[in-house]
Amino acid sequence: IPKDVYDVMNADQYSQYLGQAAANSNTPLPTGYKLDSQTGKYHFQDDTNTNWFDEVFKTGIRQNHNVNLSGGGAHNTYNISLDYFNQKGTLEGAGPNYERYTARVNNTMETKFIKFQTSLVYSHSDQDNMGLSNASEYVQGLYGDVTNVLRGTLMMQPTIKAYDSSTWVLDNLVGIANNFNYDAYGYGVYYDTVHGDISASNPLLVNNLLQRNTRVDRFVGTGSADVDILKMIGVDNKNHKLNYKVNLSYSKTHCKDFTWIPAWVQSNRVYLSKSNERLTKGSRDYSDALIENVITYDGTIGKHHINVLAGQTYEEEDTDLLTGWGINFTEPYFLQLQNASDTYSESYEYKHSILSYIGRINYNYDDRYLFSATVRRDGSSRLTRNIRWGTFPSVSVGWRFDKEKFFPFDQNVVNLFKVRASYGELGNENIGEYMYQAVMSRNNMTYNFNGNVVTGSAVSTFVDNNLAWEKKKTY
């Protein structure tokens, strides 16, 4: 038996197991199994002997290719790279598979008193996912009661065919399907009366008919400029530095989601429900913009060293979600939402921004006596308007005993011995958007006026007008 693979029963072993279980429990034997009166052994009605692990698992393939070009001169360097990555999963069928293209351009340029840095990255990925559970299709890809691929591989009987040409049309075999052109597309299925009720799905059918694809386009651009102010005005002093730095970044992500769950994937038996057949299409757009301005002074006078920083940051995140889904499709399938019997859609849009100011001073004398103080002032769009600002101070002092003359140990034995005390406050605004505002909802909001049902709107959430920063003190 290969390493990490279950030692599963073959058809003869399973037939004996099932027959003995039925005899011991005094329950009817499924009609596909018979007891040979001469040998005393149980046999299935045909010679089907499927090793589901051999059928479902395959050798995965991964490849990665990269082209890189770099160069530059005395004051300028650049790097350009192209990358291709492809990974085929270890399961037969639609997933998991992953493909990605990436292009990157980096550049650095320096003059006497200013340094510029830029970085541009674009990537495109295409991912096929497998059926893992019955969670939300955006997460796992399945809706309703269904056996996932891995569990089905373990539970399917060896007497069930992996592929079966007779299942292309099952109308005359499945009573509930008589009004539809149901088929299993040539994959093996089982019948309660023949095989018994095992509540599992053919993992090959599930992982081939289920389509769950996500395509992602992402762009990230960053840039910075670092200015040596003293050099710019003609003052060059190695003991004093005054720098201004601006950081800019912007990212944009567009995701396109596609999920198709045909009726057979929904079923854990050969009888099924078209009402669970579902096509979902959606797009997700995310963007993030950041600007940072920082001015720093660093100076040394004798044994005194001081570093002072003042800065401002602003970050804005935007989210735009659009999802449409349709239920119950006629065959042959043409997978567009308007071809569904019932269609639904929803969309959401969010914006989150935070503005911060920061000041910090670090001081040490002879690298023995240490002092640091910081204060932040942050304002968040998630909090109530008149109390959305918070102030968060911190302070620390330290003493390096190992720098004192009376320190009893040699530096080769103890090279650092420091006592430090600190106090600080942290802030948290990790909540949902617009929770300080009343939200009106129109979903199923109806009222009866003299026998006439009227659709309206109503406040659907509780409003807290005192949403402020959550603060935590640290020592």
Predicted regions and their residues:
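Residues embedded in well-ordered regular secondary structure
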Residues: 1-94, 169, 176, 181, ...
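A surface-exposed, glycine/aromatic-enriched loop/edge motif typical of exported proteins
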Residues: 1-34, 123-192, 417-447
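Intrinsic-disorder/low-complexity loop/linker signature
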Residues: 28, 38-41, 48, 143-144, ...
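Transmembrane beta-barrel wall of Gram-negative outer-membrane proteins
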Residues: 53-130, 148, 156-160, 218-219, ...
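Extracellular/periplasmic, surface-exposed regions of secreted and cell-surface proteins
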Residues: 63, 106-115, 119-124, 174-261, ...
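A short glycine/small-residue-enriched secondary-structure motif
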Residues: 82-84, 262-273
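Proline-rich low-complexity regions
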Residues: 154-159, 262-264, 393
